[in-house]
Amino acid sequence: MTSNFSQPALQLCYENTNGSCIKTPYSPGPRVILYMVYGFGAVLAVCGNLLVVISVLHFKQLHSPANFLIASLASADFLVGISVMPFSMVRSIESCWYFGDAFCSLHSCCDVAFCYSSVLHLCFISVDRYIAVTDPLVYPTKFTVSVSGICISISWILPLVYSSAVFYTGISAKGIESLVSALNCVGGCQIVINQDFVLISFLLFFIPTLVMIILYSKIFLVAKQQAVKIETSVSGNRGESSSESHKARVAKRERKAAKTLGVTVVAFMVSWLPYTIDALVDAFMGFITPAYVYEICCWGTYYNSAMNPLIYAFFFPWFKKAIKLILSGEILKGHSSTANLFSE
């Protein structure tokens, strides 16, 4: 690739600085394509998740414990898109870090915190959907706004504490000081943690994922049983009361929400599993993964932050209506917050 450039064969991130990292640039064509692909992901993550947050906060019909969790998840994904992805894009394509050591630590801390915050949010959302579908009568009293607030707080505090410990205490580098020193160069920003913290990171992914798989498996079984009961009830009693009809519609909506969020969980697993496996392999096999494979795995997790709004837009009619009202400027008009987003 260096044959396409007039510079010396060996390029450095900082040509006139001792201890500079070696630069491995892409040729112009792939470079432009990568900037477009990564940039599109960042824009989608920022704009899409911002629309989710605005929708939930503005429209009163969406003010529910479950939707507050979704808005908080979107906030985490929004922060990934605006504070992590643009700088990671430059690092991935230029193979150099040009933003200083202090910001490297902050960027890495935000990267880990916001991404794992998304994981915990999805786990709590699965708990919410499980209660809503399996025990709908007591759901309003079990999963209240205060309970949702506690879940949101945990989803933010734990990842922030963990990532701060990793990047600001030095404890994660204990036992691998020689490796950290060998990889340290001017213009680099590489996350290197010891095996103990790699295992902790794996558990932060594995335990919530296992909880989600178990709960959504139960949700789909119960939802299938409920669908059969409702179909039998409706066919056997054409003259059902409006109250019973309303309950059936609400139950159907809850099941659809559970299925939609189930798709979100599947997308999350597809995005995160390669990176998690790669991190484990590297930690115990001596960083054998090629750089380009590692970058693909990393950007898989980043792109997960951009996928959720697309899933909502595809499956949630209320989100489509909210987007139309926001983009058309209708939300600036009086009483727009009381718009009916669930009308048939």
Swiss-Prot record:
GO terms for cellular component: plasma membrane. SMART domains: 7TM_GPCR_Srsx. Residues 1-31, 89-111, 168-195, 282 are extracellular. It is a multi-pass membrane protein. Pfam families: 7tm_1. Disruption phenotype: Mice lacking Taar2, Taar3, Taar4, Taar5, Taar6, Taar7a, Taar7b, Taar7d, Taar7e, Taar7f, Taar8a, Taar8b, Taar8c and Taar9 show no visible phenotype or behavioral deficits. They however show an absence of aversion to low concentrations of amines such as 2-phenylethylamine, isopentylamine, N-methylpiperidine and cadaverine. Signal peptide: none annotated. Disulfide bonds join 21-185, 104-189. Residues 53-67, 133-146, 217-260, 304-344 are cytoplasmic. Keywords: Cell membrane, Disulfide bond, G-protein coupled receptor, Glycoprotein, Membrane, Receptor, Transducer, Transmembrane, Transmembrane helix. InterPro entries: GPCR_Rhodpsn, GPCR_Rhodpsn_7TM, TAAR, TAAR_fam. Gene3D superfamilies: Rhodopsin 7-helix transmembrane proteins. The keyword Transmembrane applies. The chain crosses the membrane at residues 32-52, 68-88, 112-132, 147-167, 196-216, 261-281, 283-303. Its main location: membrane. It is found in: Cell membrane. Glycans are attached at residues 4, 18. Specifically expressed in neurons of the olfactory epithelium. One of its GO terms (molecular function) is trace-amine receptor activity. PANTHER family: HISTAMINE RECEPTOR-RELATED G-PROTEIN COUPLED RECEPTOR, TRACE AMINE-ASSOCIATED RECEPTOR 8. Olfactory receptor specific for trace amines. Trace amine compounds are enriched in animal body fluids and act on trace amine-associated receptors (TAARs) to elicit both intraspecific and interspecific innate behaviors. Ligand-binding causes a conformation change that triggers signaling via G(s)-class of G alpha proteins (GNAL or GNAS). Belongs to the G-protein coupled receptor 1 family. This is Trace amine-associated receptor 8a. It comes from Mus musculus. The gene is Taar8a.
